[in-house]
Curated annotation (Swiss-Prot):
NCBIfam families: ATP_synt_b, PRK05759.1-2, PRK05759.1-4. This is ATP synthase subunit b. F(1)F(0) ATP synthase produces ATP from ADP in the presence of a proton or sodium gradient. F-type ATPases consist of two structural domains, F(1) containing the extramembraneous catalytic core and F(0) containing the membrane proton channel, linked together by a central stalk and a peripheral stalk. During catalysis, ATP synthesis in the catalytic domain of F(1) is coupled via a rotary mechanism of the central stalk subunits to proton translocation. Component of the F(0) channel, it forms part of the peripheral stalk, linking F(1) to F(0). F-type ATPases have 2 components, F(1) - the catalytic core - and F(0) - the membrane proton channel. F(1) has five subunits: alpha(3), beta(3), gamma(1), delta(1), epsilon(1). F(0) has three main subunits: a(1), b(2) and c(10-14). The alpha and beta chains form an alternating ring which encloses part of the gamma chain. F(1) is attached to F(0) by a central stalk formed by the gamma and epsilon chains, while a peripheral stalk is formed by the delta and b chains. It is a single-pass membrane protein. Belongs to the ATPase B chain family. CDD domains: ATP-synt_Fo_b (cd06503). Gene3D superfamilies: F1F0 ATP synthase subunit B, membrane domain. Keywords: ATP synthesis, Cell inner membrane, Cell membrane, CF(0), Hydrogen ion transport, Ion transport, Membrane, Transmembrane, Transmembrane helix, Transport. GO terms for cellular component: plasma membrane; proton-transporting ATP synthase complex. It comes from Shewanella sp. (strain ANA-3). It is found in: Cell inner membrane.
Length: 156
């Protein structure tokens, strides 16, 4: 093995090249690699955070949907109760109106009945007076009297 000046020159040049690369080339490459690793790690962390945020938002939306459904069911239930109340009030009002109309009808019937009775009394009184006049016009004959009374009874 011959060591000559060329081999020593090449070794010195290689050592200088390695030193130059370690001093000036390697640090920017390492910085670029580390920056890229950091960006990738940050991106993965952001993705994980986004997934968690999405899950949280979905859970929140599900809760809000359940709450909205519960509120809607409550409103529907209240509306049904109000409807039933209105129907009951209308029935009660209709029953009261019906009772009022029936009472009014009964009162009208009673008034008409009383009027008819009064008319009948007047007619009976008139007939009785007419019968008495006829009896008085004739002689006080018991046979004629009986005949007139029978006619009056037949007319009444």
């Amino acid at each position: 093995m011959n060591f000559n000046a060329t081999l020593i020159g090449q070794t010195v040049a290689f050592i200088i090249f390695v030193w130059f690369c370690m001093k000036f080339v390697w640090p920017p490459l390492m910085n670029a690699i580390e920056a890229r690793q950091k960006r990738i790690a940050d991106g993965l962390a952001d993705a994980d955070r986004a997934v968690k945020d999405l899950e949280l938002a979905q859970a929140k939306a599900t809760d809000q949907l359940k709450e909205a459904k519960a509120t809607a069911n409550e409103i529907i239930e209240q509306a049904n109760k109000r409807k039933a109340q209105i129907v009951e009030e209308a029935k009660a009002e209709a029953d009261a109106e019906r009772a009022k109309i029936i009472a009014q009808g009964k009162a009208e019937i009673e008034a008409e009945r009383n009027r008819v009775k009064e008319d009948l009394r007047k007619q009976v009184a008139t007939l009785a007076i007419m019968g008495a006049e006829k009896i008085l016009e004739r002689s006080i004959d018991p046979a004629a009297h009986s005949d007139i009374v029978n006619k009056l009874v037949a007319e009444i």
